[in-house]
């Protein structure tokens, strides 16, 4: 028994179906923006640039496939993830399939850093992190030049 949950779709829809009339949805559009980020150590990126570039190209191809063939992409998701087709159809519109690096990522991690300091998870005497020193868009720019929407040093 729980008082509240916060989950990604399609599991929110599944919880609603299981909970019936006892479940209430608190709508908070754009309260949270879900991203999936690719991370690599700098030494790995330098040594494996070709491999990382291939991964980025494969993701871009997958995004193009999803956009060109949404019904088939949904069928694959249903088959491979075992999710009910009605659930997939109901949550599909909230997803944005894109290979990109956006200003919002930097804004989000900066906000998380401020929260961590404010809540005492980070010692106050530590300097603010320089996130731009840890973000490298060079390989993504080679694969998809328009995928990065802000200027990096």
Describe the function of each predicted region.
Residues 1-80:
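Pocket-lining segment of extracytoplasmic ligand-binding domains
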Residues 10, 28, 91, 105, ...:
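Residue-level "edge-of-site" marker
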Residues 15, 33-34, 95-96, 133-138:
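Short secondary-structure boundary/hinge segments and terminal tails
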Residues 26-29, 43-48, 107-111, 140-150:
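Short, structured secondary-structure boundary patches
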Residues 27, 41, 102, 132-136:
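Helix N-cap / beta->alpha transition motif
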Residues 34, 40, 93, 127-128:
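Glycine-rich, flexible loop/turn motifs
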Residues 46-125:
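Secondary-structure end/capping motifs
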Residues 117-153:
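Conserved C-terminal helix/tail region of periplasmic/extracytoplasmic solute-binding proteins
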């Amino acid at each position: 028994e729980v008082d509240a949950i916060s989950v990604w779709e399609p599991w929110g829809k599944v919880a609603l179906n299981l909970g019936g009339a006892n479940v209430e949805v608190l709508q908070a559009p754009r309260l949270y923006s879900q991203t999936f980020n690719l991370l690599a150590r700098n030494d790995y990126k330098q040594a494996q640039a070709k491999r990382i570039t291939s991964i980025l190209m494969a993701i871009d191809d997958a995004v193009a496939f999803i956009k060109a063939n949404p019904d088939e992409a949904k069928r694959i998701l249903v088959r491979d993830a075992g999710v009910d087709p009605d659930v997939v159809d109901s949550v599909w519109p909230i997803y944005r399939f894109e290979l990109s690096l956006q200003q919002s990522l930097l804004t989000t991690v900066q906000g998380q850093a401020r929260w961590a300091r404010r809540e005492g998870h980070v010692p106050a005497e530590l300097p603010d992190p320089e996130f731009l020193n840890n973000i490298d868009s060079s390989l993504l720019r080679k694969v998809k030049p328009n995928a990065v929407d802000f200027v990096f040093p």
